[in-house]
Regions:
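Intrinsically disordered, low-complexity repeat and linker tracts
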Residues: 1-2, 293, 297-338
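A generic structural signal for short, solvent-exposed coil/turn residues
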Residues: 17, 132, 143, 279, ...
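Intrinsic-disorder/low-complexity recognition with aromatic hotspots
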Residues: 19, 187-189
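Short beta-strand elements
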Residues: 95-124, 277-309
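Short aromatic-acidic-glycine turn motif
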Residues: 172-183
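Extended, compositionally biased non-globular segments
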Residues: 215-294
């Protein structure tokens, strides 16, 4: 299903707003014959569209209505089912009786100035369903395939003040293929799209915030940076910039080694005196950043500002530390101080 409607910011889907979404459904018989949708072995936007209307989930198009056969069916659903024109190549899916995959490439939505948003992509499956189960109603439990990432900040000392203008994360995988699990209680798996162009399959950068003036002046209470504007990212393991090693001392060497770091434009003051930047100028520091982003988890990072590194790997004040947590969108299992 395609739409020209432009999104403005990623909106994580919760049980409270699920009814504002739609999804596309496929159903296959035991021998792999398509009963709803079609045997789809190429990425696209096929399937039977289901929407929430008049208090219930229903077929968007009456012509798609299907009645229960005598045998069991395996159902697969992809949410959202409506794809805006600008995201058609970023988000696609395919489904057959044996393999179901999602192709998704994230966009730098907070840095691109396009007004478009990443999708909180989800899937659901219900295998071996018959007309006698659940009064003939197929029950879907949608699961997120992406990770959610947000930031807060504190200062290292109570007499410090930090003014943040921009934060970016460098050397992050932008997308890949997600293969649905064999059973509904599985987790699925991500793989790299090696056959796609480097700008799609390679590493990129994500903007956390830009062109802002966020003041941080407490070493006990964290100041919010992006908890209401979360980034949605592909789950992955991030290897932090190894600034202490000779082979990866500089930022350029870290880029070549595919090591991850934060780029932060800020001003740092202590007792009113500028340690970094000035009243009229932000300065850029770089901070090694590593963690494992998990599927369906919300990762919360608290930056503890005391300094960082320049692009040659030389210390600027004291390096920033982290405190990290994750729960299930759910936040991921721990808070991470950075």
């Amino acid at each position: 299903v395609l739409s020209n409607a432009a999104e403005t910011r990623a909106t994580p889907t919760t049980p409270d707003n699920l009814k504002n979404t739609d999804f596309d459904v496929f159903a296959f018989t035991g021998d792999g014959t398509a009963f709803m949708g079609k045997v789809d072995t190429e990425f696209g936007h096929d399937g039977v569209n289901i929407v929430y209307n008049n208090g219930k989930w229903d077929y968007k198009n009456a012509s798609d209505l299907r009645y229960w056969p005598t045998g069991a069916l395996d159902f697969y659903a992809f949410n959202p089912g409506t794809v805006s024109e600008d995201m058609m190549m970023n988000y696609m899916w395919e489904a057959s009786g044996t393999v179901q995959k999602i192709s998704y490439t994230c966009i730098d939505e907070y840095g691109a100035n396009t007004g478009h948003a990443n999708y909180d992509v989800m899937y659901a499956m219900a295998k071996g369903q018959t007309k006698d189960m659940n009064n003939g109603i197929v029950k879907f439990n949608f699961k997120h395939i992406l990770s959610q990432v947000v930031f807060k900040a504190k200062t290292q000392y109570d007499n410090m003040q930090v003014d943040i203008n921009m934060i970016k994360i460098h050397n992050v995988k932008m997308g890949g293929f997600f293969t649905l699990p064999a059973t509904a209680d599985g987790t699925g798996s991500w793989s790299d799209p090696a056959d796609l162009p480097s700008e799609v399959s390679g590493l990129g950068k994500f903007t956390v915030v830009k062109d802002v003036n966020i003041t941080v002046k407490s070493n006990t209470i964290a100041t919010d940076i992006s908890t209401t504007t979360p980034m949605l990212n592909r789950p992955q393991e991030l290897t932090a910039w190894k600034v202490s090693e000779t082979a990866t001392k500089s930022k350029l060497e870290a880029d070549n080694a595919k090591q991850c770091y934060l780029e932060i434009a800020c001003k740092i003051r202590q007792s009113g005196a500028y340690l970094l930047g000035s009243a009229s100028e932000y300065k850029t520091i770089y901070v090694p950043f590593g963690d494992t982003w998990e599927q369906g988890k919300r990762h919360i990072y608290t930056l503890i500002f005391g300094g960082g590194y320049d692009d040659q790997g030389e210390a600027v004040l004291n390096p920033i530390q982290f405190d990290a947590e994750t729960t299930g969108w759910v936040n991921a299992a721990k808070d991470v101080n950075v």
